[in-house]
Regions:
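Short amphipathic alpha-helix with an adjacent loop that forms part of the alpha/beta core around
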Residues: 1-5
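Short SAM/SAH-binding signature in class I
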Residues: 8-9, 136
């Protein structure tokens, strides 16, 4: 409980909805975050999580969360629609802010007032494993530095574009530091 109380954010993976114990832990974590005014971010994780565990996912975002991360397919599944604008409206109903990744097209983010579209830099993608996790981690890192949602989306798009150029779900430390220097100048 102290770890949650002393945090700025809790990040809940949508995959937790598949297991009764994982789902219970996610709901308890969210409740503790609310108790201590800690912001909650939820990742939808996979279109299948939204489709086949919809009730559990809905329970995880019930009452609203600060931030949702999802890709376009997950957003469409959440909105039960075929158009991004409809999906955006559905996510606005459960999240004060959100980011929808669009693969090679970049991302769309909502900061509570403005919708931002960020284009991705063209890259030669060899493996998309880890792109969503890299995006979420980079976005939250940028926010922890005091950056705006737009700047966080720009940095996260750059970072996700970097990880897909390699096999494996993550970048090594030097590559992460290089990205930070490239984007933030430090």
């Amino acid at each position: 409980e102290a770890a949650i109380r002393d945090s700025d954010w809790v990040y809940l993976e949508g995959y937790l909805v598949t297991s009764p114990t994982g789902h219970t832990a996610a709901l308890k974590t969210k409740a503790l975050a609310e108790k201590y005014n800690v912001r909650t971010a939820v990742s939808f994780s996979d279109p299948g999580m939204v489709k086949f565990f919809r009730d559990n996912m809905a329970a995880m975002v019930e009452g609203g969360v600060e931030l949702v991360f999802c890709n376009e397919a997950e957003a469409m599944e959440w909105g039960q629609c075929d158009h991004l604008d409809e999906a955006i409206d559905a996510i606005k109903a459960v999240a004060r802010r959100f980011v929808i990744t669009l693969g090679a097209q970049g991302a769309v983010s909502w900061d509570g007032e403005n919708l931002h579209r960020v284009a991705a830099k063209p890259v030669e993608a060899v493996n998309t494993n880890g792109a969503g996790d890299m995006f979420a981690g980079a976005f939250l890192y940028a926010l922890s530095r005091g950056e705006s949602d737009l700047r966080a989306t720009e940095f996260a798009t750059l970072a996700a574009g970097e990880v897909v150029k390699y096999f494996g779900p993550r970048l090594d430390r030097d590559a992460c530091l290089s990205l930070r220097r490239q984007f933030f100048g430090d």
